[in-house]
């Protein structure tokens, strides 16, 4: 479909088919559309509202343009859409480290911050992790430690085509929604945080289309009136679960896991150095109860989708044991140490 036809279709408020959106994204990534056309398409899609077939079509195109890496069919990603304005520290990154120390194989896909002061890549860098490992080194890290961090710019180089357009637009677009779907390891087990019920429905549809084996899509309310893209310590957490093609919905409360309610302010983050200190304090046992419990709540979910336990309550027990026994602190040190050994071995230039 020509760009003019696409624009007319979106102006009329009509949805694109999966195939139309895949072709559209191919044209964008291959440099066939001008900047002005791309900006118009993104703005019109956002105004109309993106539907599942459009998201699935864009996903298919971007994965075809990506550098993929084979890690494990059991690997888990913990990733959120961002945009919830909760201002929390890097809970999903912390959860991935705790889950890894509990025996879950983690393939975390992430980037530097877009909507917060500190993204997953930022905080890992502050912990001493070098982001720019080549794929073969990342495979070695995963085999050795059970953890991989897949730095988005290395695996999705075609996204540079739209980076300046997204910056100039300054609004959320289709690309903000795609992040959790674009793991280069093509994981089939995920904990996905979203910031609305509508997005939960959308992601469930797309994850079914893309063959998810076990996924939890999470958003939560708070007493402060903020919607989070992670479990809440003082409100209701809404979970859409996908397992082997079946969709189930749950609601959770912190007290079900023995978690004491805590205000959102107790989970506030800051810059990458501040958030790295929080992660280190959780690992060494000196963090506040609220900081620890928020990480364990998400870790329980990662352990569950990773197949380490039969239910979320057992996942909480498994994650808590790993943290309190010192396994998480040891795992964090192991990951950073081997990452740095690989930097030397592969002559990686640090940014």
Curated annotation (Swiss-Prot):
This is Anthranilate phosphoribosyltransferase. It comes from Chlorobium chlorochromatii (strain CaD3). Catalyzes the transfer of the phosphoribosyl group of 5-phosphorylribose-1-pyrophosphate (PRPP) to anthranilate to yield N-(5'-phosphoribosyl)-anthranilate (PRA). Anthranilate 2 binds at residue 166. One of its GO terms (biological process) is L-tryptophan biosynthetic process. It comes from the Bacteria. Pathway: Amino-acid biosynthesis; L-tryptophan biosynthesis; L-tryptophan from chorismate: step 2/5. GO terms for cellular component: cytosol. Belongs to the anthranilate phosphoribosyltransferase family. Binds 2 magnesium ions per monomer. Mg(2+) 2 binds at residues 229-230. Keywords: Amino-acid biosynthesis, Aromatic amino acid biosynthesis, Glycosyltransferase, Magnesium, Metal-binding, Transferase, Tryptophan biosynthesis. Its cofactor is Mg(2+). Disulfide bonds: none annotated. It is an enzyme of class 2 (transferase). PANTHER family: ANTHRANILATE PHOSPHORIBOSYLTRANSFERASE. 5-phospho-alpha-D-ribose 1-diphosphate binds at residues 80, 83-84, 88, 90-93, 108-116, 120. Mg(2+) 1 binds at residues 92, 230. Homodimer. It catalyses: N-(5-phospho-beta-D-ribosyl)anthranilate + diphosphate = 5-phospho-alpha-D-ribose 1-diphosphate + anthranilate. Gene3D superfamilies: Nucleoside phosphorylase/phosphoribosyltransferase catalytic domain, Transferase, Pyrimidine Nucleoside Phosphorylase, Chain C.
